[in-house]
């Protein structure tokens, strides 16, 4: 993992290789890592997420996202999810709605994440500590 400061936001970027994130306990570990590095946002490569994350009926996406949001840590899923989105209207809608907000983003790559961090935040998505 590495830490980057992007447009005034401290970002914890997970490595492509590593254990899959599949449970609320894994999300709690992300929170701990983010806090220990004073990161506001955790960027997770799509390859690190359990495939069940993208099957919304499992509830895993909600559990993981909620755990981070509870601790005011934002989440960015980084990578190509076009194949799984094409197979699920519900997931497509979830991704679209998430990308409208400021807590969970699905981005194609780190360049898109950096561009999102430059854009103004939606109302109600105050930065931690503000």
Question: What positions do the PLM features span?
Answer:
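Amphipathic, Lys/Arg-enriched alpha-helical "gate/interface" segment within cytosolic domains
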Residues: 2-130
